[in-house]
UniProtKB/Swiss-Prot annotation:
Homodimer. Heterotetramer of two MnmE and two MnmG subunits. Its EC number is 3.6.-.-. The keyword Nucleotide-binding applies. InterPro entries: G_TrmE, GTP-bd, GTP-bd_TrmE_N, GTPase_MnmE, MnmE_dom2, MnmE_helical, P-loop_NTPase, Small_GTP-bd. The keyword Ubl conjugation does not apply. Binds 1 potassium ion per subunit. (6S)-5-formyl-5,6,7,8-tetrahydrofolate binds at residues 22, 85, 124, 459. K(+) binds at residues 231, 250, 252, 255. This is tRNA modification GTPase MnmE. It is found in: Cytoplasm.
Length: 459
């Protein structure tokens, strides 16, 4: 594939020990040699070596930076192109200067995700593996990173390719049936083979979809909304879980006027914690905006932490709020157990029925462990499944698998109903195409561009 040479900073901007400028493309080594001065020309050194030298401005002859340069020659590289990585001291000014010099002497600034896109276009990885690269970068927990690494290694890809190959074998048998319709024994054998193989494919798709709920949570986080009357301790709970003071905690009811969101690792489960403004009628315009956002957050939540105040008796407002959330996955928390108990716990139990109940004191940090265990148990039965198994964690993949399950079921129904094989062939082919979209073999250029545009620069 004839592509130009791209360049980008591949490390986070800011002060640090090391900053890396990466080049990839047919002119990568040549461009670097125009700037690099060391014991040998980079063009003359072996592949996969690191070389000490300096970056020199060819025009002013000024020494710009002391560097270590990695030379990686195609095809045994991430992009399957020649790659140069210039390791600089991690300062904004210097690394930008090196980047500008690479562009001055022939490289183009890379688009977001373009290095990974080239790896995909050059056949180094497929689309699901490319998406997993960004999942790995963005992972919030050890489990999430392991799920992403599993996909980077191609385990999901291998399963999808296996199912697509099975469909091709069915289609080949169907073609024989279509070409020789006069042989009844061929038709009977084809129908039997089609049904047997199609049901196995559907079973495998179902197995993958069964991992989707856990996989999606590990990838995106469990959207968890903290809700309750104003001043029951919602923000204190958020702060205790994230060990931060992002939310303002005061004695004035209604001081959380917006939706505050933070990620937290709860026993290996990534929670996307949302602290909402108290949901109540208000004339304050700023607070009213926060209340509306709270209602929206509630409608999108995977888990709701419903907080009550141990120091106050249940009110009609508590009952009204619980009525709003009771049909969702809820954990009820009676907070402020360090204060005098004015709430009737039996009344609380009557209101919530079998809903889990935890008693906490955020001030004394009591009950937090019990809360974390309850969250884990509620969604994962106390233990996430074997980390070596292949999870489907990407919403796009889950959607496509659901479509594939439907089209393979359509093929099964049609075959069992005696529909002509050329009609069954349509559903089988569509299933093959849908599965191909997961790994990028049948994905449109527009979809590919859109997916890679979500990557960070330098990746």
């Amino acid at each position: 594939m004839d592509l130009d040479t791209i360049t980008s900073i591949s490390t986070p901007m800011g002060e640090g020990a090391i900053g890396i400028v990466r080049l990839s493309g047919p002119q990568a080594v040549e461009i670097a040699d125009k700037l690099y001065k060391g014991k040998h020309l980079l063009n003359d050194v072996p592949s996969h070596t690191i070389n000490y030298g300096h970056i020199i401005d060819p025009e002013s002859k000024e020494v710009v930076e002391e560097v270590m340069v990695s030379v990686l020659r195609a095809p045994k590289t991430f992009t399957r192109e020649d790659i140069i990585e210039i390791n600089c001291h991690g300062g904004i000014l210097t690394i930008n200067r090196v980047l500008e010099l690479t562009m001055t002497y022939g490289a183009r600034l890379a688009e977001p995700g373009e290095f990974t896109k080239r790896a995909f276009l050059n056949g180094r990885i497929d689309l699901s593996q490319a998406e997993a690269v960004m999942d790995f970068v963005r992972s919030k927990t050890d489990r999430a990173s392991k799920v992403a690494m599993n996909q980077i290694e191609g385990r999901l890809s291998d399963l999808i390719k296996k199912q697509r190959q099975s469909i091709l074998e069915i289609l080949a048998q169907v073609e024989v049936n279509i070409d020789y319709p006069e042989y009844d024994d061929v038709e009977d054998a084809t129908t039997e083979f089609l049904l047997e193989q199609s049901k196995e494919i559907k079973q495998e798709i179902n197995r993958l979809l069964d991992t989707g709920a856990q996989g999606k949570i590990m990838r995106e986080g469990l959207s968890t909304v903290i809700v309750g009357k104003p001043n029951v301790g919602k923000s204190s709970m958020l702060n205790n879980l994230i060990q931060d003071n992002k939310a303002i905690v005061t004695e004035v009811a209604g001081t959380t006027r917006d939706v505050l969101e933070e990620y937290v690792n709860v026993r290996g489960v990534p929670l996307r914690l949302v602290d909402t403004a108290g949901i109540r009628e208000t004339e304050d315009i700023v607070e009213k905006i926060g209340v509306e956002r709270s209602r929206k957050a509630l409608s999108q939540a995977d888990l709701i932490l419903f907080v009550l105040n141990n120091n106050e008796a249940l009110t009609q407002e508590d009952y009204t709020l619980y009525e709003v959330v009771k049909n969702e996955d809820v954990i009820v928390i009676v907070n402020k157990m360090d204060l005098e108990q004015n709430i009737d716990i039996n009344e609380v139990k009557d209101m919530i029925g079998d809903t889990p109940l935890i008693q906490t004191s955020m001030l004394k940090q009591e009950g937090i462990d019990e809360l974390e265990i309850q969250i884990r148990d509620l969604f994962f039965g106390g233990e996430v499944q074997n980390q070596d198994m292949t999870y489907v964690s990407n919403s796009r993949h889950i959607s496509l698998l659901k479509q594939a399950r439907q089209t393979i079921q359509d093929a099964i129904d049609a075959a069992e109903s005696g529909v002509p094989m050329d009609m069954v062939q349509i559903d089988l082919t569509r299933t093959w195409e849908i599965l191909g979209e997961i790994i990028g073999e049948t994905a449109s250029d527009e979809l590919i561009d859109q997916l890679f545009s979500q990557f960070c620069l330098g990746k």
